[in-house]
Amino acid sequence: MGFPILSLITFLPILGMIIILFLPKEQSKTVKWLSLAITFAQVILACVLLANYNYNAAGVFDEKSFQFIEKFRWINITGISWLGTVKIDYFLGIDGISTPMVLLTAIISFIATLSSWSIEKSVKGFFALFLLLDTGMMGVFVALDFFLFYIFWELMLLPMYFLIGIWGGPRKEYAAIKFFIYTLLGSVFILLVMIGLYFSTTETMADGTKVFTFNLLAMMNPANSAPDGILSILNPSNLRFIAYIALFAGFAIKIPMFPFHTWLPDAHVEAPTPISVILAGVLLKMGTYGILRINYPIFPEITRQLMWWIALFGMINIIYGALVALAQKDFKKLIAYSSVSHMGYVLLGMASLTATGINGAIFQMFNHGTITAMLFLIVGVIYDRAHTRGLNDFGGLATQMPVYTGFVTVAFFAAIGLPSMSGFISETFVFLGAFSINSIRIIAIVSTLGILLGACYMLWTLQRIFFGPLNEKWATLPDLDKREYAMLVPLAAIIFFLGIYPSAMINVMNKSVNTLVMLVTKGL
């Protein structure tokens, strides 16, 4: 097994949380610095993973080609007559689909910790919950056992509920409850399908006996299907189709995909800035990651049937999100709806079932994480100074806050997809993949309207806030401080680096994506 680096990067925040709980509440500075050190250590560990990553290993369904594997028997219960042996493994590993998400989670968690420096209310509680949330997010991207995946998935629910419900805005309770109900509903769908797949998948033990398993890789291989399993690929039925829809819906709520999106604007508007950064930067990606990791390889025949519908919902997300963003007068709500729109590009790329399109989709997941995190930080900077997010309340800030204006311009142009910035590459790959498939070409053509609408609402927002005469009310607003530089400079650097040298990320993904496409389109 070697050094358990995946366990370390996943559970290090839990260790930090335990230490924080034993610290006196008066030591708020110590709590903040400890949290920052923990999340910075995660960034270092993620970089170590990337530096030692083997680009030629595929992963996806082959355990031997996953990297940094940690696997041992975690739960083993025998003697239950109707269940037989219950076997659950502690099984972690990464491939080209999960590695970019591990890196993204580490980076965004560190940036969000910096953004949390202004938190003064119940500092111990905030950072303890934040670090617990961090472990849940990281665990989702490294777990290869469905039961373990589900534990990490659920682990995020309560911390996020309390982080919004306690430290949020005026309507924080409503937003937190709405988030909780939507996410819990999705979790119920995922749980039901997980149980069905468990009783439809067997694994051969050392003594030759077969037992049911939660192993995700075993679920992808038809050779492990139980002939009489309700969701067995050897026993095709409408139940497999229903299970696919239920599982997809469970993940779609987190994306969020229209019409499951209504919790997101409320959660973003009421959440404190660091939690909006985490929500947009990482949590939304978990939905599309779950579809790629579980739906696609376990139900390949249904994925092929529904690719047109996935593309259609991607198009709806793109255009609907952009149109609603165009109508917003609240800066934060505008960015929230722009997230709905940009996650539509991920769905469109995934729907193409091509290596180009899915590479673009995963790259878009990473790029959206960094760009949208930067956008929410930008909203937080101006709100901390002016205590308003009304787009029509400002004007002429470019002369008063020139450095801030520069960072806003970078983030806005990256969101639009300007060449030399990371968003351009991922969106180009998405459309190349979608245009290459006859059945979804019309959908891809209509979806390009989202690019035009995105440019409209971003440039109009830029004009309203930063150009024209300066509102005298804001004549004394200070420009960025050192902490804000530390938050924004790394994200801007990543945006330009991946825009100029996208191969740094695409090379990590490509082998795994090719293998996934082969599995979904041709089978094992």
What are these regions, as identified by a protein language model?
Residues 1-5, 23-114, 118-128, 209-211, ...:
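Transmembrane helix-loop-helix hairpins at membrane boundaries of multipass inner-membrane proteins
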